[in-house]
A protein has these predicted regions:
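Short, conserved catalytic or adaptor-binding loops enriched in Gly and charged residues
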Residues: 60-67, 113-115, 179-181, 237-249, ...
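Rossmann-like nucleotide/phosphate-binding core characteristic of flavoprotein oxidoreductases
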Residues: 1-8, 12, 16-31, 46-50, ...
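Dinucleotide-binding/catalytic capping subdomain of oxidoreductase cores
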Residues: 157-275, 345-353
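Conserved Rossmann-like nucleotide-cofactor binding loop
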Residues: 13, 38, 105, 155, ...
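Conserved N-terminal/central alpha/beta ligand/cofactor-binding core
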Residues: 38-39, 43-97, 106, 115, ...
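Glycine-rich FAD pyrophosphate-binding loop
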Residues: 26-41, 180, 192
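Short acidic, glycine/serine/threonine-rich loops at helix termini
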Residues: 43-45, 87, 109-113, 159-162, ...
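Glycine-rich dinucleotide-binding loop and its adjacent helix/turn
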Residues: 107-181, 302-307
Length: 405
């Protein structure tokens, strides 16, 4: 009897999970179920649109569906409430094993009064808007001239880079030309950690150095940077800046904690920070972008270290361990969960009457399911719609995506 496994979520965790399961227990039927009509989740909608090298992992994931027999069932919303097409209980009735790999998408908040005011944006939502995610098209952020980015990790530098680049800097990307930001003249990137505690990588700083229209500055001198490649890269970038040709000035601030937002007429006017020694600093701004991670407090299920929620129900990726780790780190995580599932299957988790798996989904939802072949048609439509200098023109609404099938 072939065990039927459903993976909920077609992002990197879900795809790595399918890869790992294919190796750990090759004689199973695997179906990846996705709420959106398109696969690849975070890779498609969360990776910066000018980082096509990172997005290239999609080619690896495509082999799951093209050569390894994994099923894709898009446009099926598993969950609770009126928006759901299928409850988790119903899904478990038709699959022997269910793995939750839906990730996290809610931006972590600063915890300041006025944070939900216009002009204060989470980096996750902004990145999804720039990546044409159907659920974030109403965001339409207005950045103005002066932007404060709160956070000092790689995502914060992604935001800075995408705000500072000009239209020609996005050649080869899938960034919609209509969404290139041209209004920003001043960016302040502010982190609560001292410089040596910053979370960004040196390669991300070096990318800033390639933006000819960007003048990079420091709010205070860096100290003892000889053993720190990240800070050396930052110092080199500051030294190489060409202020006379700069369109945008970027200033790094380290060791400042967000204290208060100044709101007037439902718009942010400034943000105040406090240092460890109690000093205060206020930065005027037209918008604030927070890049301080994702909120995992709303996770409904928590698994053990092996990703086990209960017998037959597992979790992986950020859904399992919270918003930590890179795309490659998800691969290692799913290998551990897959081995546990393989062991449980060997111990008889699927004993009893045969469950129908993907066949039951097809019977219930019919042609409303988006298959992998349907995705290939969508993919072709987007590639053919690419603007000059772009690699694709993404469809921005679920309705438009489904019309391409």
């Amino acid at each position: 009897m072939t065990s039927k496994i459903a993976i909920v979520g077609a992002g990197p965790s879900g795809c790595f999970m399918a890869q790992s399961l294919g190796k750990a227990c090759p004689d199973v039927e695997i179906t990846i179920i996705e709420k959106l009509p398109v696969p690849y989740g975070l890779v498609r909608y969360g990776v910066a649109p000018d980082h096509q090298g990172t997005k290239a992992v999609i080619r690896q994931f495509a082999r799951l569906f093209e050569k390894q027999g994994v099923n894709f069932a898009g446009n099926v919303n598993v969950g609770a409430g009126d928006a759901a097409d299928l409850s988790l209980a119903e899904l478990r009735d038709i699959f022997d094993v269910v793995v939750l790999a839906t990730g996290l998408s809610e931006d972590r908040r600063l915890g300041l009064a006025g944070e939900q005011t216009g002009g204060v944006y989470g980096s996750g939502a902004v990145t999804r808007f720039w990546n044409d995610h159907p659920s974030d098209q109403a965001l339409a952020p207005e950045f103005g001239n002066q932007v404060v980015v709160v956070g000092n990790g790689n995502v914060a530098l992604d935001v800075v880079r995408l705000l500072a680049k000009g239209a020609d800097d996005f050649n080869g990307s899938d960034f919609d030309p209509a969404r290139v930001v041209t209004s920003v003249t001043d960016i302040h990137i502010v982190g609560r950690s001292p410089a040596h505690g910053a979370k960004f990588d040196a390669v991300m700083v070096k990318e800033l150095a390639k933006i000819g229209s960007l003048d990079v500055r420091l709010d205070a001198p860096l100290c003892d940077i000889q053993e720190d490649k990240r800070l050396q890269a930052l110092q080199d970038t500051v030294a190489a800046a060409a202020p006379n040709t700069a369109k945008t000035v970027l200033t790094f601030h380290f060791g400042w904690v967000p204290e208060a937002l100044d709101i007037a007429h439902n718009c942010v006017r400034s943000i105040t920070f406090r240092s460890q020694d109690g000093a205060m600093k206020t930065l005027p701004c037209d918008s604030v972008v927070t890049a301080i991670g994702f909120d995992d407090s709303r996770r409904e299920f928590v698994g053990d270290g092996d990703g086990v929620i209960e017998r037959g129900l597992y979790c992986a990726g950020w859904f399992k361990r919270g918003p930590r780790g890179t795309i490659p780190e998800n691969r290692h995580d799913t290998q551990k969960v897959a081995q546990r599932i393989a062991n449980d299957i060997a111990d008889g988790i699927a004993k009893g009457h045969a469950k129908p798996g993907i066949a039951a989904l097809k019977d219930r939802f019919g042609e409303s399911i988006v298959t992998y072949d349907d995705w290939l048609a969508i993919d072709c439509t987007e590639i053919n719609a690419a603007a000059v200098g772009r690699c694709r023109g993404k469809l921005k609404t679920v309705g438009d995506i489904l019309k391409a099938v």
